Amino acid sequence: RWLLLFSVGVMLVSLGLALVFNYKYLDVIEEAIFRAVYLWKGSYNYMFTTLAGIAVVIVGVGLMLIATRFVIRSVITVLLPDNSERLVDIIYEKRRLGKGPNIAVIGGGHGLSVLLRGIKAATSNVSAVVTVADDGGSSGRLREDLGIIPPGDLRNCLVALADTEPLMEKLFQYRFKGKSELAGHSFGNLFIAAMTEVTGDVETALRESSKVLAVKGEVLPASKEHVRLDAIMDDGTVVEGESHIPEVHKHIRRVKLFPPHVQPVQAALDALTNADAIILGPGSLYTSIMPNLLVDGVAETLRKSKAVKIYICNVMTQPGETDGYTASMHAKAILDHGGQGVIDYMLVNNAPISKEMQAYYAKEGAYPVEVDEEAINALGIGFLKADIINESDVIRHDPQKLCRNVMKMVDGLRPGNGSDHYMRSRHN
């Protein structure tokens, strides 16, 4: 009905303009107006036709504006039934986020998704480059059964960047229970697996999945090839498979990919090249961050990049992977695998951890990571100490605190909010 009202308005505007400019095909209407004026006034008034035309134009424009307003409201009600009153806020938010810096994040596991939940509040120009070496759980089973790259970490990143209803997030994270073949699989993993087979390509599958979840940014696998992560221990033994590495509880000398030369996803390299800032972690040092650096071209792209390159250090050591590691040892391991210049700065926690929580983690063999400042300085890396944790029943990085401090570093390592910053020269 509003479109009909708009059409009536257009007709009235056209009629009014014709009357104003004395269009010849409206002689009948003009004559009728003259007769009416003559009967009313007793004389002819040629200005009345012009005034009548102007009045008709005004009425027509008014009807068009009213119709347009209600048409827009009807469309918004359909597309945004619960948020129609927030349209201006939504438009403003999208414009603000669209002007944010280009940030590329590298990693995998739970830690990366925590960072993404915070970063998406500062910019929508986010690219997550995700490890594909996972071989455990639902991801490992789908990898073996369907021959696809493991979808678990990709799913977590999609959900973290999603701007959708909580129910959709719960759906993608839902794990089937019971004793059937579906037991242990998450719906999101199955969805990505199905989308990959339907589209024939995992990159396309992720793009289409991003539309379903209204993702802010993009999620990219580091590679589309099937890879295995192996670890060489200090005693020379080799452990095959990402999920088996922490189980042996030996000191890791180095990790490697099999096959040794793995082709990268070009879109991932482009995201790193075009980034204003590149963030590594947080996440498992050897099993979430390192596999990305071992993909051909990734470490080289990082070294050549002029972006601010930040490593977010873990808060606690990880049993079987980083036992006894200090902050500088985390950074040195990254430099040993990726080369000098893959990171410029570190973000480390300086918030105290309660004795009760330390005792709880000590039972699992995990301890707070010591920030050894002099050793970090010796590596030529700048660092920022800040409160970046959320201590509840477990110790986790806090998304908002991570975002605030990362953006501070991206904007120039400005001090404030009770944190200490230490700038070192950037690598050339």
How would you name each of these model-derived features?
Residues 1, 324-428:
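C-terminal functional extensions of proteins
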Residues 85-100, 263-269:
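A short, basic/flexible loop-to-alpha-helix module at the beginning of a structural domain
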Residues 110-116, 282, 287-294:
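Short glycine/serine/threonine-rich phosphate/pyrophosphate-binding segments
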Residues 1-83, 99, 131-249, 405-407, ...:
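Electropositive, gly/pro-rich neighborhoods at or near active sites that engage anionic ligands
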Residues 133-139, 287, 309-311, 316-320:
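Short gly/pro/ser/thr-enriched loop/turn and capping motifs at secondary-structure boundaries
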Residues 292-299, 325-330:
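Charged helix-capping and loop-helix junction motifs
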Residues 221, 225-284:
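Active-site gating loop/helix substructures
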Residues 124, 305-309, 343, 381:
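A short helix->loop->beta-strand "cap" motif at the edges of active sites that frequently abuts
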